[in-house]
From Swiss-Prot:
It comes from Streptomyces mobaraensis (Streptoverticillium mobaraense). It holds the Pfam family Peptidase_M4. It is found in: Secreted. Its cofactor is Zn(2+). Its EC number is 3.4.-.-. SMART domains: CADG. Residues 640-760 form the P/Homo B domain. GO terms for cellular component: extracellular region; membrane. This is Transglutaminase-activating metalloprotease. Binds 1 zinc ion per subunit.
Length: 760
């Protein structure tokens, strides 16, 4: 079996009662505040409701655990179905279940017992376990010549420490001995060491620098930071309800209704857990810095809102989806102007800044989202994936801030607008035009992965704004925005709620550790297609938002016609060519063509060009397709008709059926030429098939010599084969019967060899 595209699943999430108490010193609203709609409406652009079946189920921890057990029980069979090597093993990381029955299982991989960095993948399957599609961080076959390193671990550690010290760490050695891994995130997989060096970065943030070193050559292959940094808003926001627990005669800042999330006071320390906040009367803080509990309430409340947002909007029960809460630490260091998420402690940490602690709604949402990203796609915190990691936290922080609907801190597309980090009242980041901060980028360019992740996040933040609200000037919630596009064309927004759902689905069900901007576009279009339909208004507007930041093309708003490429035929030999087109509206398409070679015509209803060319020469052909709304699309190509017998082109246009998971079939061409074949024999192949990854394709010479033109690929779910292959046929005689041999090796689909051609 191999992946066969389809969809999702159902369960119910248990809702728990909220034990809340009144606290003084932070925002005015309930933790269960609804979506901001009346106060801060998004412009009515093109906002549609998603397909509820494609949305995730609210799984309880026990339901999620059962799905993970099921995945573990079948992971060996899954690995076999995916065609993994004998030394490759799957490790279940997470399972997401959609309301229509599809299961999305996220795996990591090992090779001969070693972790494979960049080997993660997501497999979509039916409720019964039938694999449908899969998305992999790497398409390379995982294999290394040996798992015995040439380089000593001590040498790798020495180089890693040197790299960390160059970034401000004072550490003299690694946190622990380097571990052997297979590095597969970029290029050909190699045996490597991963070394983690601790210490403190230049700004006081803890460091966990991961350095990847080639275990044979000693070359540094990659490095990334394990501690994710972020920012937030003011602590002064009115009264709120927070979740606490009574213990004896006092109360603890321990929210047992949200996985036991606790908030601690570091009291200006920089290590350890700190002291759990307690209070005698369950009234916390006084709204100023004079009471350490004020910052604690802000952080606790922000974590509470973020938990509720993920659960109520996206069906995720906690950061890892297992119902277990993280914890928060406030008053880190002395005047530390930042906040961070740390996987090693499963916690958020907040500094006091320059008199304004970084402990409010959007900073909590930003940091907690780093945890969600780590538990799902685990976007590597470096290069383009690192920028996407940061942008994910900014997007979800913005979504949470709007969802909270707090009048003291209304939602906006500004990051850090109240902490005054710049000292002049300006925000830290702008989503409508990121370059306004002086460092972030508005659009993708080839060098984007080489800058700081907080600035390479700019284009993705810009995409989120454009996808949510659209381009151009507008006022939202009292804030003026004016969002440009890199191609100068307008973008229509799909609504903030829809944009957030699309990104979250892409993050949790499609993206992998090394996803770049192109991969993020692909993932969000997949998610938009699942939720709203491929070629829907929402799908096309999501694509246009990506085009507006220089990632991918604009979506067609009319008819899209696939170019068949230039054609070559033989005079007096029957041919056929199927033109493929899609429209953005329902209804039939109408086909017409100009410039066809004499003897050929096009079927106006089906788009099939057929006939027998009667005259040699080259024609310029244009095919035009019209939909029921009168919109048109076209494609142009050349069609050359050659003479037959002893010529350079030989073709077979007789269709041959390809049975599903059956025996190989062949299509012959009789070549009448003297001498041997050329060193660059061209083989043009046109096959109709709904899942081309099923197919192996071989060319067989008259003497039996065989060339493999195409291997099967369980991950290649695209339809049809229309390719030109080149082989060195200089060692075989050209004269005789050549064969195209095709076999469907996986069950689920069948197809047809439409035609193939040899050009000598």
């Amino acid at each position: 079996m191999r992946p066969t595209p389809q969809r999702r699943a159902v369960a119910t999430g248990a809702l728990v009662a909220v034990t809340a108490m009144l606290a003084v010193g932070v925002q005015t609203t309930s933790a269960n505040a609804g979506q901001d709609k009346a106060a801060h409406p998004a412009p009515r652009q093109s906002i549609h409701k998603p397909d509820p079946g494609a949305e995730p189920v609210k799984l309880t921890p026990s339901q999620r655990a059962e799905l993970i057990r099921d995945a573990n029980a079948t992971k060996a069979e899954t690995a076999k179905n995916l065609g993994l090597g004998a030394k490759e093993k799957l490790v279940v990381k997470d399972v997401v279940k959609d309301k229509n029955g599809t299961l999305h299982t996220r795996y990591e991989r090992t090779y001969d017992g070693l972790p494979v960095l960049g080997g993660d993948l997501v497999v979509d399957a039916t409720r019964s376990g039938q694999v449908k599609t899969a998305a992999k961080a790497t398409k390379q076959r995982i294999a290394v010549a040996s798992t015995t390193p040439s380089l000593a671990a001590s040498a790798a550690e020495k180089d890693a420490v040197k790299a960390a010290r160059a970034k401000g760490s004072k550490a003299g050695k690694a946190d622990k001995a380097p571990r052997k891994v297979v590095w597969a995130a970029k290029g050909t997989p190699v045996l490597a060491y991963e070394t983690v060096v601790g210490g403190v970065q230049d700004d006081g943030t803890p460091s966990q620098l991961h350095v990847i070193t080639d275990a044979k050559t000693g070359k540094k292959l990659f490095e990334f930071q394990g501690v994710k940094q972020g920012t937030g808003n003011s602590q002064h926001s009115g009264q709120v309800q927070i979740g606490t627990t009574k213990s004896g005669s006092s109360y603890q800042m321990n929210d047992t209704t949200r996985g036991g999330h606790k908030t601690y006071n570091l009291n200006h320390g920089s290590s350890g857990t700190g002291t759990l906040f307690t209070d005698s009367d369950d009234v916390w803080g006084n709204g100023t810095n004079s009471d350490p509990a004020t910052a604690g309430v802000d952080a606790h409340y922000g974590a509470q809102l973020t938990w509720d947002y993920y659960k109520n909007v996206h069906g995720r029960n906690g950061i890892r989806g297992d119902g277990v809460g993280a914890y928060s630490r406030v008053h880190y260091g002395n005047n530390y102007v930042n906040a961070f998420w740390d996987d090693s402690c499963f916690c958020m940490t907040y500094g006091d800044g320059n008199g304004i602690p970084l402990t409010s709604i959007d900073v909590a949402a930003h940091e907690m989202t780093h945890g969600v990203t780590s538990a799902t796609a685990n976007l590597t915190y470096s290069g383009e994936s690192g920028g996407l990691n940061e942008a994910t936290s900014d997007m979800m922080a913005t979504a949470v801030e709007f969802w909270a609907n707090n009048p003291a801190d209304p939602g906006d597309y500004l990051i850090g607008e109240k902490i005054n980090i710049n000292g002049d009242g300006t925000p830290l980041r702008y989503m409508d035009k990121p370059s306004k901060d002086g460092a972030s980028k508005d659009a993708w360019y080839s060098g984007l992965g080489g800058i700081d992740v907080h600035y390479s996040s700019g284009p993705a933040n810009h995409w989120f704004y454009l996808a949510s609200e659209g381009s151009g000037p507008k006022d939202i919630g009292g804030v003026h925005y004016d969002s440009p596009t890199s191609d100068g064309l307008p973008v229509t927004g799909v609504g903030r709620d829809n944009a957030a759902k699309i990104w979250f689905k892409a993050l949790t069900e499609r993206m992998q550790s090394n996803t770049d901007y192109k991969g993020a576009r692909d993932a969000t279009l997949w998610a938009a297609g699942e939720l709203f339909g491929v070629n829907s208004d929402t799908y096309n507007n999501v694509a246009n938002a990506w085009a507006a930041i220089n990632v991918g093309p604009r979506a067609s708003s009319g008819v899209s016609v696939t170019s068949p490429g230039d054609q070559t035929s033989i005079v007096n030999q029957a041919v056929s060519l199927q033109i493929k087109a899609t429209g953005s509206t329902s209804g039939a398409l109408t086909y017409s063509a100009t410039g066809l070679p004499a003897g050929l015509s096009i079927n106006a209803s089906t788009g099939l060009i057929s006939g027998t060319p009667t005259t040699t020469g080259t024609s310029n052909v244009t095919v035009t397709v019209k939909d029921s709304a009168g919109k048109t699309g076209s494609t142009s190509f050349k069609w050359t008709v050659n003479t037959t017998g002893g010529g350079s082109v030989f073709e077979n246009t007789t269709q041959v059926a390809i049975p599903d998971a059956g025996a190989a079939v062949t299509s012959p061409i009789v070549v009448t030429r003297s001498g041997n074949g050329p060193s660059a024999l061209k083989v043009d192949v046109n096959i109709t098939h709904t899942y081309r990854g099923d197919l192996t394709i071989d060319l067989v010479a008259p003497n039996g010599k065989t060339w493999r033109l195409k291997n099967s690929d369980a991950w290649d779910s695209a339809a049809d084969v229309s390719e030109t292959y080149t082989v060195d046929a200089s060692s075989v005689s050209a004269n005789g019967t050549w064969k195209l041999k095709v076999q469907d090796v996986y069950s689920g689909d069948s197809g047809t060899i439409d035609k193939w051609r040899l050009t000598f």
